[in-house]
């Protein structure tokens, strides 16, 4: 009805071939085939988008339009991706802001894949001792784990969890190394949107939900609820200070170009203006006056570099993720384990298929929670991504029973420090529950791929003085467990959930995909990738199909909650899937359709060069092709 239509994957997947005639000569479906047909009986809400020159899938229609304009005016995928980052930081402030993070993966036409961290570091004053001994803030914290009457944890909001902003440096480095346009050209759409743009339902609602917190910070209230009134959907929303900040950065570039500097050196001048100039000083002064830890010296010492991504090969497909400072390797570990199973024979989204994916993820998450951290500070076991280690882990999976334990691996004399053995959980006010992420994925005909997971500085955020820049809260992803790899330390990156993904097939571009969803991200992306790679779903079907979510992990932020063996299933799945997984020992819970928390976007390059784009309709994701 309308644009809705039944998913047309049955013939392509070969899942409903009729069996041989029985007694009366009629061709009948086997029980397995009937069950598979019922699993596939769900509706595709949006059509797949296809393009010949380029395709993009991003967080909102406005960001997607900005991206397409840059591509159609001659910019490459990185130019377009940086423009999308900046525009998203303005318009998607419920999920992501200028002071936040943006890990990037980029494939260049020469076939090389590059990683840019896009996450800031802890200030010099952000120490374990500080958080173990500080007093609770009664306005931001309901209750806390007590250690000698102290809180013992990092707060989720305010200025204390603020890191050095990482997104700006990531955008500038990507543009400088892999783009073709000047900063001013890719920043102009963001500056115009900051001057004013129509606010959508999601952003209006996020301001309403955060109103009690915003009143604690006059700088935030002045931006998000001027005159004490939240903007309603369709109102023109202004961020005058942020527009002025962006335009001041553009002026720094123009001055450098006027002085005869190259494009690359002029972008470096923008970087210096932000991290060593008046913007850094104003943010640092504001944070200090509020009792926070971020200082000008932390900005001046910060610099990102292009890094080598992590990688595994799954049935001839090269899958790339960012380093162990993200949770990205969870996907790689799960793929290594699943490579030992015949997933086609199990059948897409059958109970046994879901069971094997969930059990593989449980093992990978146990390793994440015990071992992953900033490799510049800790030695992460290299064996985690080996095929032999995956084989050893696969042997732990019982095909007939769900595991209820956290089982991180052990490496020689090194023993894991798993957070499940420590008291971390604490309640939070609803208004302060973590608010999610956005995503940007681009593919172009020249072989470039761009994948980003922008996040941080989400609502309710603290606006730093007159800069218009919201501060990130990402410091709360550190742990306060002495001896844990992800323990808070000055200059360190927290182990974050943000996880862009690139896939090639024998070196040729295949997919770029990412999603919001915090700890759901790797789970959602695993399901999207396998749907596209193993079962040949198109990009839209892959991101929109019913998904599960395991909560058998340690939450990466907020209350660091643990819900062993809890498995959420999309209500679009047939009842027998719920029943069979319950019989296997999973603690199954129902999740409303199209309300999963994750909302993947993806682009997929076909063998003939046509590029597909898909966007989960949850949370306003939008795709376009050209």
What are these regions (language model features)?
Residues 1-10:
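Bacterial N-terminal signal peptides that target proteins for export
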Residues 34, 280, 284, 292, ...:
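Internal maturation/activation junctions in enzymes
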Residues 446, 492, 525, 534-595:
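Extended C-terminal subregions enriched in glycine
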């Amino acid at each position: 009805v309308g644009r809705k239509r039944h998913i047309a994957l049955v013939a392509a997947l070969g899942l409903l071939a009729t069996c041989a005639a029985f007694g009366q000569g009629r061709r009948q479906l086997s029980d397995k085939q009937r069950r598979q047909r019922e699993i596939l009986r769900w509706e595709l809400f949006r059509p797949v988008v296809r393009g010949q020159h380029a395709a993009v899938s991003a967080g909102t229609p406005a960001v997607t339009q900005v991206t397409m304009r840059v591509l159609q005016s001659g910019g490459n995928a990185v130019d377009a991706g940086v423009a999308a980052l900046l525009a998203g930081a303005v318009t998607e402030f419920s999920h992501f802001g200028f002071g936040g993070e943006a890990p990037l993966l980029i494939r260049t036409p020469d076939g090389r894949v590059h990683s840019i961290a896009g996450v800031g570091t802890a200030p010099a004053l952000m120490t374990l001792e500080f958080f173990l001994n500080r007093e609770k803030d009664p306005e931001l914290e309901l209750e806390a784990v007590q250690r000698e009457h102290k809180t013992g944890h990092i707060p989720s909001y305010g200025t204390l969890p603020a890191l050095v902003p990482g997104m700006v440096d990531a955008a500038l480095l990507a543009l400088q190394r892999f783009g073709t346009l000047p900063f001013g050209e890719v920043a102009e759409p963001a500056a115009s949107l900051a001057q004013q743009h129509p606010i959508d339902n999601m952003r209006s609602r996020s301001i309403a939900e955060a109103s009690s917190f915003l009143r604690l910070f006059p700088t935030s209230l002045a931006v998000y609820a001027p005159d004490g009134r939240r903007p309603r959907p369709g109102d023109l929303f202004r961020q005058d200070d942020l527009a002025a900040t962006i335009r001041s950065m553009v002026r720094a570039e123009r001055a450098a170009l006027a002085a005869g500097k190259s494009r690359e050196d002029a972008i470096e001048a923008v970087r210096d203006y932000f991290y060593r100039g008046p913007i850094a000083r104003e943010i640092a002064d504001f944070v200090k006056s509020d009792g926070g830890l971020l200082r000008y010296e932390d900005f001046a010492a910060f610099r990102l570099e292009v890094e080598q991504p992590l990688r595994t090969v799954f049935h001839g497909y090269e899958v790339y993720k960012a380093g162990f400072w993200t949770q990205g390797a969870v996907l790689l570990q799960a793929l290594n384990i699943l490579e030992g199973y015949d997933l086609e024979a199990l059948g897409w989204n059958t109970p046994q298929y879901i069971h094997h994916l969930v059990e593989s993820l449980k093992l990978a998450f146990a390793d994440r929670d015990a071992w992953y951290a900033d490799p510049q500070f800790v030695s992460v076991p290299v064996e985690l991504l080996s095929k032999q280690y995956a084989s050893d882990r696969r042997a732990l999976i019982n095909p007939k029973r769900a595991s209820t334990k956290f089982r991180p691996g052990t490496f020689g004399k090194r023993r894991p420090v798993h957070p499940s053995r420590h008291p971390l959980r604490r309640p939070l006010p609803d208004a302060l529950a973590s608010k999610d992420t956005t995503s940007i994925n681009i593919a172009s005909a020249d072989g470039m791929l761009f994948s980003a997971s922008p996040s941080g500085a989400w609502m309710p955020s603290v606006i730093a003085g007159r800069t218009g820049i919201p501060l990130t809260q990402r410091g709360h992803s550190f742990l306060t467990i002495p001896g844990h790899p992800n323990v808070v330390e000055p200059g360190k990156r927290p182990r974050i959930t943000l996880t862009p993904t690139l896939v090639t097939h024998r070196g040729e571009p295949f997919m770029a995909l990412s999603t919001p969803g915090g700890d759901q991200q790797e789970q959602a992306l695993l399901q999207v990738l396998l749907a596209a790679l193993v079962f040949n779903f198109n990009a839209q079907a892959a991101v929109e199909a019913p998904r599960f979510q395991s909560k058998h992990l340690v939450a990466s932020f907020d209350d660091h909650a643990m819900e062993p063996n809890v498995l959420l299933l999309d209500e679009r799945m047939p009842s027998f899937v719920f029943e069979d997984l319950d019989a296997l020992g999973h603690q199954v819970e129902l999740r409303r359709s199209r309300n999963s928390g994750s909302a993947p976007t993806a682009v997929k390059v076909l063998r003939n060069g046509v590029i597909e784009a898909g966007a989960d309709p949850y949370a306003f994701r939008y795709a376009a092709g050209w």
